[in-house]
Amino acid sequence: MLLVAGGADLYSAASDTLYAVQKPVADTPDSARNAKLPSLPVKSHGLISQFTMPECVMFGKRDIEKMPYFELTDILRQTFPAAFPQSLGGFGGFNSFSVFGGNAHDNSLRFNARPLVSPMFGTFLLDQFPPEMLERTEILTGTDAVVFGDNSSGMLINIQEAIHDVKKPYTRLWYAQSDYNFIASDGVFSQNFAPDWNGTFGFRRQSYDGRFNNSGFDIWNVRFGLRFSPSDKTTFTLTELFTNHGFGANGGLMPDNTDFTNPITALPRISDLDERVFRHDITLAGSWRPDSGFAANGSAYFSGENWEINRGSAYFTGVADTLRLMQTRSAFVGAVLRLEQKISDILFLRAGGDLTWVNSAASVYADVLSGVSAAGYIHASWASSAGISLRSGARIRIDQDRTSLSLGAAVAAPISSQIAFTADFSRSDRAPSPTEGRNLPSEKHLLALAGLRFGPDSSGIIASMFSRYISSPIESIRITDTNGNTLGTHSFSGDSRAVVGGFIRGRTFLFKRLFAQCWAQSYFGGGAELPALFGGISAQYEYKAGASSLIAGFSVSGITAYRGETFVPQTWNYVATENETPAAFDGCSVFATAKLGNARLRAVYSNLFSAHIEYTPYYPDLDRTLRISLSWAFND
């Protein structure tokens, strides 16, 4: 897919608004000359840190304009190639990532630095979040991830809300279409309706039949944002995201299918089960940055959801389970506070905490989760004039039934003008989710990272290694009836295990506008849940003519054989597979994006050779597919 040459740091600049050029002139009356100009919003509002995080991967809304994407996981896959995609083969389902040998439950998602999670499952459906709602996205790993977030020894993703600062009405429309009757649209309207005030409204609608039986979805959401900036140093926002997200949960294909490529004859494990969530996420956030050395920000939030699991009688779990439609209601209310202080030219301190009340009802698939939890952290960063930087921190969380501790330290040091060394060591706990069983002990993760960087990020080489040791890992097995129907999972604490691996990526400009990269991931140990080798190569050429541009390129990747773990939809847990997943390549993809004025057309012809590949066992990736999307912004 499309390449991003380094983490971008783009945002709505002051030049985007007519307020930036309003200046009093000599013949202006005194009353007008002394009038207060409208304030600009704090550009770092909603970020984990109001100041620079050196080891943070970041991309912004201007970056994703160049990408052929349909959902948030499409963007993450193109911007963070060190993650292994745990894709379910289509759109709208629980597509996630394995980072440094972890799994989807080791990743944490935040919006404006407040947590987004489904309490029953202990994780979040990434593609539930509309990409058009983001301004910038931070991806943290290692020490920074486990200190600033919970259950995040894989990665911590924080999404900053979109910042629109326009005097005239701003409108952006997005439309997408693909095979298997995929149709999607998105709209955004925003305007400064009074000095220092902005209102934003958006919607998103998607539908998809799916390649295989019971793998489609039907999704829509609406969103609203209100911003008040009384000064250039202070910003308050109120946002609401309502989601209605329904999808077929077929559990992957049956292992004994003779042909995994024929959507007519390939039989799914579960033919009569679908899930739908109705969810509200309301966030009141504030940021205050009085000077270049101090910042305070926080948020109060509410999230409520109703999960519906609609099942045929063949998937009832026992004689007491007689309702076809099972509903589980969850809610959590909380507050987050973060303080940052520059102690000296070389020392920064960050501290904060959160307080949360959660209530998630019990069901045939999940334990009850109810009560108050609290967390606090401290993070210090030190940078010398020689370019050496140190970061360390600790986080403690007290839940209803356990205490979790996370801590770590990291160093970055230049070896020469073109070579830099990084190392990171962290220790963290992951609490079990209600669907795993709250009576289980927490997992304990030890993660060591080491890397070398040669040259700049846009045209250099990155090589890194990791080692992850997991004590009391939470493992799951499939529960079936006498007919082989999947009824759910049973989780338990397994034997300690370790996984080691590496990642290497090289980027270069072959010519002035011809950009190429190759990359590879490697994994060993840990029960062979991940392939020994996963790698690829891609290239793109960009042509510019005034304000218009054309980008075209290709990408191809492949994996070696591995056993892996497959996904069980009733509990969102992974179980060991019966068979080995064969080595495969992704069939090669070609893509192009064209910009003409404020309109942008994107097209991807993926899997040209209709190759069969499974990133999650028994969930084949899409075959030859044409994806087209068009966006058009007015008064941008």
Short names for language-model regions:
Residues M53, H105, E135-R136, M155, ...:
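Transmembrane beta-strand segments of Gram-negative outer membrane beta-barrel proteins
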Residues G122, I282-W307, T328-D636:
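Exposed, low-structure sequence patches enriched in small/polar residues
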